[in-house]
Amino acid sequence: MIHQYPGVIIKNNEEMPYPRVCAHRGFSAVAPESTMAAFGAAVAIGCEEVEMDLWQTADGVIVASHDTGLERVSDGTGDLKDHTFAQLRALDFGIKFSPEFEGTRIASFEEILNRYAGRVIMNLHLRHEEQGQDFLTGYIKKIVSLIEKYGDEKYCYFMASNIDTLRLLQRIAPQIERCAGEEDKKPCDYLLEKALETGCTKIQLFSPFFNRYREELGRDCVAYMVEKAHKCGVICNLCIADEPELTKDYLAKGVDTLLTNRAQLTQTLRNQYIRVNGIG
């Protein structure tokens, strides 16, 4: 593992116990989402995981950003994918969050690895699925090459919703774990079927779909999916767990990893759950 910032190496993705807290786009309640400040804040409070969305710039640099549009998160305009890395670095990715973060720059994936490889487990949401197989293959290989450069294979896992992307990941990088994400307008059971077909070790439930699933199943979908997944040896992530009562409910139903924008609150609730239930 090579990086210029010496520090503690944590347990890897196979060893780290559950339930875990995954800081969604970093600790995005206290710092601009998907920036080094947000990831650093998540690591500082001891989150086991951080989640990030990875895009490729016009000149081939892999960067972290949820939006492909620049307007919400920066002082720029247009599509991230149409800008070079230098053009993106000239933009301010902090000013719209708070004046205190003025001057915050977009982070490349290599910068993130250089600082945090081995210090936090990374849930890597792959994007660009609409750009075709050839592009996607090159994009994935570039990300895998960076992960291998920093020896972070056991501290990362890929999250993708498209079954063809999951198959491609299985072929290109079988050594890196995969997580199957949900797709709009697909039946509830399809998520686990897709995960098993593509050798995924995790699934990621998405709370905006829960009402539709509840109507489809006629019962609580979280308990149903967690039970089915665990019977197959599959880990369950859930996105998003921001509300305290819902978070407690998700933990009680056996959700393994909680993606959250309120990392410290969710961490407190998780720790209380562990103490009360004598876990660990």
State the predicted function of each range.
Residues 1-280:
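Phosphate-group recognition and catalysis centered on beta-loop-alpha active-site segments
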